[in-house]
Every structure is written in C-alpha cells, then in structure tokens.
C-alpha cells in the first residue's frame, strides 16, 4: 500500500523516516521493521531486499559521472554477477522509462528525471519497504503525474511505500491511507476520502471548493466527473 504522512514543518516527519531507516537512533521507544527490532539488524542486512530510502534531494544519491556508473557501482556492492549486471540495470531503466538517461550526468537531468533516476537506484536494492521524503518537491505537473503512476506500479508489485509530504493533492491521488503528524505524534490515520473530507486545513483544493455540492470528492478528476454526471458546468 501507499501511506502518506502530512503535517507542518518541524512536526517530525523527516525525523521519523530517518529513525525507521536507521540513519538516526530514537531517544526512547523502539522501532521494528518486518517484525524485527532495528538494533538487531547487522551491517547491510536491513538494506538488501528489505528497506530503501529516498531523500528529499535526489541529487544526494548520485556519486558518479553518469547514472549508469552509479547503478553499476551499487549493483556490484550488492554482489550482482558481472554477467547479470547489464540486464539488471536495463530492467530497472525500462520500468522507469529512463534508458535514454543512463549515460547522462545526474546533475544535468531535470527535477523529474533526477527523481526517477534516483528511484531506479534504490530499486536495485529490491526493497519491500520504500521511504520517500517529499518526492514531489521541485518537479513539474507532468513529472508529478509520471511519479504517481510509478508509485502505483510499485504498489502493484508488492512494495509498501511510506511517504511524507506537504503535497495534499498528490497524497490524495496516490495514497491508500493518509495520516496527520502533529507535535511528534501520528494523531489520525484514515482513507484519503475520510482524511481529507473531515479536515478543514489539511485538505485538497478540489475538496475545499466542491464540498458544499459533493461531500466525498477530493481530487480534480473526481469533481469533474461528478459535474459531468450531474450536468453541471461549474461550481458556485
């Protein structure tokens, strides 16, 4: 499933991801990933075929002169055989439609292209859980739509996605559940429809504008479809 956490600046959303990924340690309490205490994982055990994390700035995951070199370096670290290396890279690149970007310098890519290339790199880890920190930051509407379709595809492949974001429209489009992070606590978790329709502040523009006519519409597409069904050309 895709789970989105929303909340104000300083609420602790990014800190939560860093604790789950093992980057930071909690001051108190415990973290379990796949039923195992985080402290019990040794070396790279947590990050191979279990958990991967994509930071807010996708540029930070790239270390080499081309996207391909970055992918090759990571695949080798993971123990990928030389005979399987190119097939593995091509499989990821084709899935994300970035084959034409493999020989480009990561910093020469657009924001949306960098985001997809960065996701490609973490997918080489074959994660069951993918953490995403503000994945739509700095990308245009078209790239955002492509990213949304990609996240839905990954969900269909059995990958769980935990995303923190300020982008309520994107969360409404792609999430199975949404939660509110307030004062370092998750105060509510519900379906996108229940979460946004019962919230006056953290809700979508579509819901805010249309809620007097359509109680459960949270995306522009839903409002447009309801208007068509009811023969209304506009909402007053």
Q: Can you describe what each PLM-predicted range is?
A:
Residues 72, 83-101:
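Conserved ABC ATPase "signature" region
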